[in-house]
Amino acid sequence: MIKLTGINKIYRTNEIETVALENVNLEVNKGEFLSIMGPSGCGKSTLLNIMGLLDAPTSGTIEIAGTKVDGMKDKELAAFRNRKLGFVFQSFHLINSLNVLDNVELPLLYRKVSAKERRRLAEEVLQKVGLSHRMRHMPTQLSGGQCQRVAIARAIVGNPEIILADEP
């Protein structure tokens, strides 16, 4: 499902070069769960962002769900990400101007799923995470744990092949 080969990530400024990842090789097969642990600043989020195609490595190759993504244009990567990957971000990244239901529907909107089907799927997944009674609430009206469940609902609503979670 995910195969990283020789992944390196170097952040450069005028004065300093920081090696975040060095020669990372990783393979995660269908049905496997992987937990990446380590101290703050060791590259966990950088690795997750590269695995999730949100950031590009300095060098190395990435294969997701049998597709080599090296060389894909930004628009292709965005469409691929939306079809194959679900994300639960450490800071949730909920849109405060949208209610819970609309936040969960968002990935389906990008996939051009009909409004009726988006609503049905979002309501179904909110029921599963125990938040159907909060559908019309805004993210600022929720607890941290509830926001986390909204983020999980948004990640799984499109039934992605792969779910990536940063400190879920």
Task: Report residues per predicted region.
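ABC family nucleotide-binding domain
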Residues: 1-168
